[in-house]
Amino acid sequence: MKIAVFATGWNGEYLRDMYHGLENSQKEFHDSIHLYASFGRLGSGDSFNKSEFDFFELADMEAYDGFLYPSTTIKEGDVKQRLLERIIESKKPCVSLEEEIPGLSFVGINQSKAMRQIVRHLAGVHGIRTFGFINGMKDTYEAQMRQQGVESKIRELGLCLMPEWVDYGNYEYRSGETYARKMIAAYEAGEELPQAVISANDLMAAAFLQTIKGTALEGKIPVTG
């Protein structure tokens, strides 16, 4: 079979794992796998990055037997919609990773359930009652599912998600760093802080911990990724 894969290089660790899986599958099944990887900057909207995303247009959809679509790596709304339309119009089989999309097969985790388990652990094992949350890009599927899980479990347990400590980043290091600097300033100003912070991914959580290291906030706020 001849398979096309579409991805944006926004998350090195996630993509490396996916590439290793593709490599192993190719060795086992001897399929021809073509990777279309764009490196456009998320949310930029400028002409340079729009041209980067136009790279996906080079794929001749009729030349392939099927597609692999790690949709959560493609977060530019118009780019994502255009690519989806081309995949669906081709009438070729396609597997979506991490996001359930009508008409496509799906492989992924239950994003909401995983976040509910994090809340349950923090509350049950560590006695946390107030939470902050740093999420991914607000309009994306996985961010919505993760927030749904956090909010529903907190409500169920009668706990508090502090609205002033719910922020949206882009899963990159700087998002966690920015959130941490905001919290350091609030702590120094004597403002109320959550007892724990839930991060939507490990990189933002690591950035948070690294940023508060050596400050008065170090060791005072547990964070999960």
Predicted regions: what is each one?
Residues 1-44, 50-225:
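Bacterial carbohydrate/catabolite-sensing allosteric modules
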